[in-house]
C-alpha cells in the first residue's frame, strides 16, 4: 500500500521505485529527475537519444538503499550491472507519471552523511543502455481525456 503525506496547503508528491532485483522503495525517495540528451543534428535527434534519471533520497535501514551502492560497484562486463527500473510518481493519490528503463546502468553514485541531521543521503545517476527504448505513461485528468 502506498502512503501519502499531507503538508499544509496540499498533498506531497510520492514516488515508488521498483528495480528488477526485487528492490522496492517508497519512503526514502525525495526527488527524481529525468533528462534526454539528443544530438544537435535535427535529422537524427530521434534515433540516438541518451535517457537518464537522477534519484535522490535518504539512506534508510528499513528499505534496501544499500543495494544502490552495490549496483554502482558492478563493472560493465558483469551482466548484472544492467537492471530494469520503474519510477512511479503519485500526486493526490493518482498516478501522474510512470517511466521504465528496461536496461539501466549506474553512471554515478554518491552518499553524504551529516552529524547535524543524523541522516545520510544518496544520489543515484542512471542511464538507459544506448539504443534501448523507454516506456513512459503520463496521467491525464478526466476533463482532458477525449
For each of these PLM feature ranges, what is it?
Residues 1-146:
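Glycine-rich, low-complexity intrinsically disordered segments
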Amino acid at each position: 500500500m502506498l502512503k501519502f503525506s499531507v503538508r499544509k496547503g496540499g498533498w506531497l508528491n510520492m514516488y515508488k521505485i521498483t528495480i528488477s532485483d526485487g528492490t522496492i522503495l517508497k519512503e526514502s525517495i525525495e526527488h527524481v529527475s529525468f533528462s534526454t540528451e539528443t544530438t544537435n543534428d535535427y535529422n537524427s535527434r530521434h534515433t540516438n537519444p541518451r535517457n537518464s534519471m537522477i534519484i535522490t533520497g535518504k539512506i534508510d535501514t528499513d528499505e534496501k538503499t544499500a543495494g544502490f551502492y552495490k549496483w554502482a560497484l558492478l563493472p560493465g562486463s558483469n551482466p548484472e550491472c544492467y537492471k530494469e527500473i520503474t519510477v512511479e510518481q503519485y500526486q493526490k493519490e493518482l498516478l501522474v507519471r510512470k517511466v521504465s528503463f528496461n536496461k539501466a546502468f549506474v553512471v554515478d553514485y554518491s552518499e553524504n552523511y551529516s552529524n547535524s541531521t543524523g541522516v545520510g543521503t544518496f544520489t543515484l545517476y542512471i542511464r538507459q543502455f544506448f539504443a534501448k527504448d523507454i516506456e513512459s505513461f503520463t496521467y491525464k485528468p478526466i476533463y482532458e481525456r477525449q
